[in-house]
Structures are given as structure tokens and as C-alpha cells.
Amino acid sequence: MFSNIDQTAVAALLRGQGCANSLKRLLENHKLSSDSTEPLIYTILNSFSLALSFVDPPSLLPHNESSLQNMTSHVLQRSSKKKYYGAEDLEYYRDESPTPRPDDGFTWRKYGQKTIKTSPYQRCYYRCTYAKDQNCNARKRVQMIQDNPPVYRTTYLGKHVCKAVAVHDDTYGSEMIKFDQVVSESVMPQLATIDEQAITMEDEAIDHIMNQECDINDFSVDDDPFWASQFPPFSSEDIMFFDNIANLD
């Protein structure tokens, strides 16, 4: 049986494989544009970066990791940023992918959905399922940022301190990673990569403005076709977490 780290690394590689095949099809059909290729390139690089980060010892791959970071910076300029929330660090991480991925190795509960004034797309809010049982304050937000091609941005806030048990699937153990073969969507694990770079200061400023515009009374969990019935309703006290974020300098 694979460990949690092994499964996460394999899932990252499989996701990179899927995006690599999508990029290959674009190249074969000569349908190249920055809008269609940048999200794929960004996801591929971060998938490998995430998988390599689990290799022990890290000192074996200083050149490769540095190269990946340099290549990623050409695709999307980013900067590290950490803020403090109470006694613990509150870190912001971002992932962009062609589809929303509700399963990223952790269990989440949807507790809010909001139409943002500065965007035509709604933003969904989640908390760790073990927020109350294990005092885990990890949160994430999912929002479509463009529709052609579709790109979904997932922003993670805080760190998981829960002891979530990953679901084992023997499919991973027998899967040979070959980059000239397409893995079906039903086989590919749904992973939202979390690399070690914080979101850009520009996105942080946008998030700050959006949070200020969000009235607690406007939050609702509606019958969205994609998210409906996947998560139970939220309690109003949970949104205070994001209200406190908006007040941070």
C-alpha cells in the first residue's frame, strides 16, 4: 500500500501526464495560443515540481528544482508572501487548472458561494471537514477566471493540521506512467497542486478587495449544477475567518 506522500506524488505525475497529452494535441492540431497553452504548461511544471519535492534527500535535485522554478517564473510571474493570523502562519497558495478539482487529497465542506463584483464568475468557499473535530483551519476558494479555454483558480489559505486518511486505490499501483498515452479522466486522480510559491501580490490585493466587497448576508449555497449536493450548508460563524483576512495589512 502506498503512503500518502507516494499517492500524492503519483497523482501529481499523472496530472502532468494528462496536461502534457493535451498540449501534444494542441501542437498536432496547430491550435496554439498563450491562452490555451499557458495553463497547461503551468500545471505540467508544477506537477513535476510537486512530485520532485517528495524525493529525499532534497539535495539530490538542486539543479532540477531550480530549473523548474525558473521555467515556471517565465510562464507566470509570482512572488512569495506570508501573513500572520493570530498565533499561526496563514499562507496563501494558488493553483490554476482547466477543470475544478474538488478532490485534492483532503476532504472539504462547501460553506459559501458568492457573486463577486469584480468578476462575472462565482467564487465557492470551502473549509476542511475536520475544522471542528481536529481544529484544522485550512480553507480554500475556487473560482473560474476565464471560460475560453476554461481556467479555474484554487486559492488555499492556511495549513492542514488534521490527520486525514487518504483513500487507497490499487489503480495507482499498476499504472505505468507513459507520456505518449492518454489516461482517461476516470483513472486520473483529481489533484489540485500546491507548490511552495505563495500567490502574487497582485492576486493578494485583488483577493483583499473582493473580501471587502463580500457581505456576510450575501453568502449562499445554491443549487449550482456542478457543486449541488456535494457539501452540506455552512454556518455563518465560519465566514468570520475570511472577514479577518480582509482586515490584515
From Swiss-Prot:
Protein localization: Nucleus
Protein name in UniProt: Probable WRKY transcription factor 64
InterPro entries linked to this entry: WRKY_dom, WRKY_dom_sf, WRKY_plant
Pfam families with a match to the protein in the record: WRKY
Keywords, alphabetical: DNA-binding, Nucleus, Transcription, Transcription regulation
Family, per entry: Belongs to the WRKY group III family.
GO cellular component, one term: nucleus
MF (Gene Ontology): DNA-binding transcription factor activity; sequence-specific DNA binding
DNA-binding residues: 97-165
Function statement: Transcription factor. Interacts specifically with the W box (5'-(T)TGAC[CT]-3'), a frequently occurring elicitor-responsive cis-acting element.
Principal location listed in the UniProt entry: nucleus
